[in-house]
Design a protein with these regions (language model features):
Chain A
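Solvent-exposed alpha-helices and their adjacent loops that cap or buttress functional pockets
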Residues: 22-24, 32-35, 110, 123-128, ...
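Extreme N-terminal cap/leader segments of soluble proteins
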Residues: 1-58, 77, 86, 108-109, ...
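Small-aliphatic-rich amphipathic alpha-helix that forms the alpha element of a beta-alpha
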Residues: 59-83, 104-112, 187, 191, ...
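Short, acidic (Asp/Glu-rich) active-site segment that either coordinates a divalent metal cofactor
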Residues: 40-43, 128-130, 144-189
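Short helix-loop capping/hinge motifs at secondary-structure junctions, enriched
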Residues: 37, 140-145, 267
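A generic local secondary-structure boundary/capping motif
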Residues: 19-20, 29-30, 107, 118-124, ...
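Glycine-/charge-enriched secondary-structure boundary and capping motifs
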Residues: 1-15, 92-118, 124-131, 136, ...
Length: 317, 317
């Protein structure tokens, strides 16, 4: 049983949804019209033993991550967070002080990103902690960026540096400490001279998430290994074998960076520059969908490798 | 560690929420303004071994209940469901066929109540199933009914019959098979001659949920044991001791009926009548908060018992 198979079953059944569903399942956020407003919604689970290790992580960082990874979805739509509701299922022996620290961290993180927690549900059981965060967002006049829309010839760009998000470097562990790219996503979506054709956040690894973009847009992509911006964590992992650098940059999950495609002329305005705190790198090009693999990698020696689904399917791991 | 203590910590911290949070934590649904719309949101968890027993329940009924118990919150606000997102954490050995049946049941139930599932998240782990359903609703011109607003002299009313929701009677098991009181809640909220002063849905048992209403409204309530509408399930449980009838009607959880208070003149229009498929019963009266227990029960012999917190705290059981 693979989570992607289950998800695709849900997406396939999106046919026949009522008109008020503006963005059906399959994007970083879904959207529904309520009154005159388009309301974007995403839901993410943070499970002890799956997405986080409570034995090895401070409770404050767990609470923080529960919110920031949901906000990464909002960033990917170029939208603004409006509020969140949080459900928690806690082991009975979790401890009240620890529970309070957890909720304080969740609330403070959410407020810091202007995303107040305005509802929730708490249950207790004899199994590991599971947090479920639902975030609501609005476009406030800017159309959300979807996964579909990439066109042949588009530059494939990413923010920040990729790979090795689990590796602590000088006290910073990216998958716990990252800043969701809300300001960058918003600036890209709002800026006519740079507005991407499509966008996604990198949670499963560039190989897999770029493949999602390609499939949604019915195109393919070629990535240049030499152009990948590699994180310090990935450098640490590949210290004994630099040829592994691109594997970590393409395959590791939980970068929580943005990946987008943009026309070549727009790309010229932003590639190599900082957009609201994040440096944009061009890593490849959108090519025609010829029925082959969605994502291909051009290695330094010029050979081209198919790399669909190299990414880390972290939710089901 | 009690879930109510944790919840009250979250509610207390609602002070200082931004203006766009219309309904802070503590009601059946919270609400936030997005654009020009007020968006109501509730989140509920359905955990195997806590809220449902997967070994003893068909997967279709599990999927159904995940949606209907969330819709009961919408009914309690007198609002209209707009859509839902569903997060599922499934044991790795759950089985694909069973997972598909579960999602089909969730989707079909949601669609039947005009509440399309437009997003979700799936994870897998080595622990029991946990479903988390977030429902969005709108007022569509009708102000939502809150828990606060009960006034001294109000009639305390309920819909349907109470207690014994776990007991199968002629193939009907209320906690699995109930219809959320969406049409009744809406008719009450929308009807000026009958609009309640406050409303809640009965998930933790009348004693506890009425106490929530009283605390939110800073009043108390007196309930007449003789006036309680008792379900067939509760009758079955109290067959050997009819004095236990009121205990089941007041204390058992998961009725998913509506409890509301309404001025005496408005009550005359609806008590003993059917409102959109649900018979309304008057079970008591709102009295002043004199610092004593929030809810008191007048027994058939005229004695009065305090019964705060008799209800079933099902989420933490």
């Amino acid at each position: 049983m693979r989570e992607l198979d289950l998800l695709s079953r849900i997406y396939d059944s999106a046919v026949g949804l009522p008109d008020r569903v503006d963005i059906p399942p399959g994007d970083d956020m879904g959207a529904v019209r309520i009154g005159d407003s388009r309301v974007l919604v995403s839901v993410d689970q943070l499970a002890d033993t799956v997405h986080v290790d409570l034995d090895a992580t401070s409770i404050e960082k767990v609470g923080r991550k529960a919110i920031t990874r949901s906000l990464s979805d909002v960033a990917a739509m170029g939208s603004l967070p409006c509020g969140a509701v949080v459900a928690a299922c806690l082991p009975r022996d979790f401890g009240e002080e620890r529970a309070n620290s957890l909720f304080d961290a969740i609330r403070c993180t959410a407020e810091a990103y202007n995303c107040p927690v305005f509802g929730g549900d708490i249950a207790m059981w004899d199994h590991p902690m599971l947090l479920t965060v639902t975030v609501l967002a609005g476009g406030d006049g800017i159309a959300p960026l979807l996964r579909c829309g990439a066109r042949v010839g588009d530059a494939v760009c990413v923010t920040g540096r990729l790979g090795g998000s689990q590796v602590p470097v000088d006290g910073y562990t990216h998958h716990l400490d990252f800043e969701p790219r809300l300001a960058t996503g918003r600036a890209l979506a709002a800026g006519k001279p740079v507005r991407p054709n499509c966008m996604i956040d990198l949670s499963d690894g560039l190989a897999q998430d770029l493949a999602h973009l390609c499939r949604a847009s019915v195109v393919a992509a070629i990535v240049d290994a030499d152009d990948l911006p590699v994180s310090r964590g990935a450098h640490a992992l590949a210290a004994d074998d630099p040829t592994k650098l691109w594997q970590h940059a393409m395959g590791d999950g939980e970068d929580y960076e943005l990946c987008f495609t943009v026309t070549a002329d727009k790309a010229a305005h932003i590639v190599g520059r900082e957009v609201q705190g994040a440096v944009v790198s061009r890593v490849g090009t959108i090519i025609e969908n010829d029925g082959g693999p969605s994502v291909r990698l051009r290695l330094p020696d010029g050979t081209i490798q198919p790399i669909d689904r190299l990414g880390w399917e972290h939710r089901g791991k």
